[in-house]
Design a protein with these regions (language model features):
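A short acidic, often aromatic-flanked loop/helix-cap motif at beta-alpha or helix-coil junctions
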Residues: 39, 138-142, 330-331
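Short loop segments at secondary-structure junctions
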Residues: 36, 227-230, 352-355
């Protein structure tokens, strides 16, 4: 049998982490609907709790179904380990809290999902963690100027939501590493099929597995994947939570116990997940595994449809601008070809010439596109970010994040593209009538 490390992406998305059940011989991954697990002996129990060996203790911390999902995500991203959580928001929260605490500072791009912006700006502030937002993530000097002695990490999205801008991962990673901190990236829109951030210098990847990885709009989940390359033990003073004895875990030092490649992800599991409890249900983990098994097939169709619709919208007189890095007119077109040669995903946004009222009429007039707060479904979706996903932000913060009053965001599904165009055409006609009436 070929070695798993030699498998291509399409094989890994089906087989990594899974094997026939040793007792029942069932081929599909079972749903292990249990709270806890029998120890072989007192010594076995003690070893598990002391991190002397790995295994299942309690489903709040780990579950065999969850483990298959984690191994598969780690394989697809090329990481050393993964932790799956109850939501993408939990993943972003854990990714920061795992190495930052009261009195610390983080640096983030401002071109991020509105929920993440709100988490960083307001909730982390209540916990004593300060954030500096980089308004132009393409400027390495702005990242460099934001560094402080108490900075613990850089954060950005590989493909920004909703600007669909491409992060120069290598450049930002270099600035982060020169400052002694890791780069954490959200790879939700791209998925590892389009961009593998570890190959470009990123250290930690987070996902809303809810979106394109799960792909069917049925299940909430999040994930953190550790690239295993950041040398925590060489930054003892900056990351004492990983390098010094943890009094809440038998005085263990995570870097000493499991080494730099696994210290971050093990700490997130046995300390944060143990204490905060954002565990994913076994049924949810199983649902997400089913989605991942068709990831490459779906993403190819998603990208094909999105590219065609972006080009179609870009050629229309009633559309003021289109944000999609797969268009030659995009300022990130060159970076898209460098980092995402197979395509830049299925999320795009555009501004109607009629402004906010035209945008509202457009959304209300669609029938095939579903008006809801999600992306990454096989079904095509639409939303008005300024009044929904980014509504918690001030008008100034919205503009910094690339959200204008009349912006409309599409998540393009895998339906027939001509049917999607017909639906968009009818809605654009309705929006045009509103604009003409306003001018009359």
């Amino acid at each position: 049998m070929s070695a798993p490390e030699t498998w291509r992406f399409e094989t890994k998305q089906i087989h990594s982490g899974a094997a026939p059940d040793p007792v029942t011989k069932a081929r599909a991954t079972p749903i292990y609907q249990t709270t806890s697990y029998v120890f072989d002996s007192a010594d076995h129990a003690a070893n598990l709790f002391a991190l002397a060996e790995f295994g299942n203790i309690y489903t709040r911390i780990q579950n065999p179904t969850q483990d298959v999902l984690e191994q598969r995500l780690a394989a697809l991203e090329g990481g050393t380990g993964a932790l799956v959580l109850a939501s993408g928001q939990a993943a972003s929260t854990f990714a920061v809290l795992n190495i930052a605490q009261a009195g610390d500072h983080i640096v983030s791009s401002s071109s991020i999902y509105g929920g993440t912006y709100n988490l960083f700006k307001y909730t982390l502030a209540k916990l004593g963690i300060e954030v500096t937002f980089v308004e132009n993530q393409d400027d390495p000097e702005e990242w460099r100027r934001a560094l402080r002695p108490n900075t613990k990490l850089f954060f950005a999205e590989t493909i920004g939501n909703p600007q669909i801008n491409i992060l120069d991962i290598r450049t930002v990673a270099d600035v982060a590493h020169q400052g002694g901190v890791p780069l954490i990236v959200d790879n939700t829109i791209a998925t590892p099929y389009l961009i593998r951030p570890f190959e470009h210098g990123a250290d930690i990847v987070v996902h809303s597995v809810t979106k394109f990885l799960g792909g069917h709009g049925t299940t909430i989940g999040g994930a953190i994947i550790d690239g295993g390359s950041f040398e925590w033990s060489k930054n003892v003073e900056r990351f004492p939570g990983l390098t010094e004895p943890d009094p809440s875990y038998h005085g263990a030092s995570y870097t000493a116990a499991v080494g730099d490649p696994l210290a971050y992800i093990i700490k997130a599991r046995v300390q944060l997940l143990r204490d905060l409890g954002s565990a994913i249900a076994p049924q949810s983990a199983w649902n997400l595994i089913q989605g991942i098994e068709t990831l490459s097939l779906r993403i190819e169709r998603h990208v094909q449809n999105a590219q065609e619709i972006a080009e179609w919208l870009d050629g229309r007189d009633d559309v003021a601008s289109v944000n999609y890095s797969g268009l030659p007119s995009s300022p990130w077109y060159a970076k898209a070809n460098e980092y995402a040669p197979k395509g830049v995903g299925a999320v795009l946004s555009f501004e109607l010439k009629g402004g906010v009222e035209a945008g509202r009429e457009f959304v209300n007039s669609l029938s095939l596109f579903s008006h809801l707060a999600n992306i990454g479904d096989v079904r095509s979706l639409v939303i008005h970010p300024a009044s929904t996903t980014h509504a918690q932000l001030t008008p100034e913060q919205q503009l910094t994040a690339g959200v204008t009053p009349g912006l409309v965001r599409l998540s393009v599904g895998i339906e027939n593209v001509d049917d999607l165009k017909a639906d968009l055409d009818e809605a654009l006609a309705a929006a045009r009538r509103v604009s003409e009436a306003a001018r009359a």
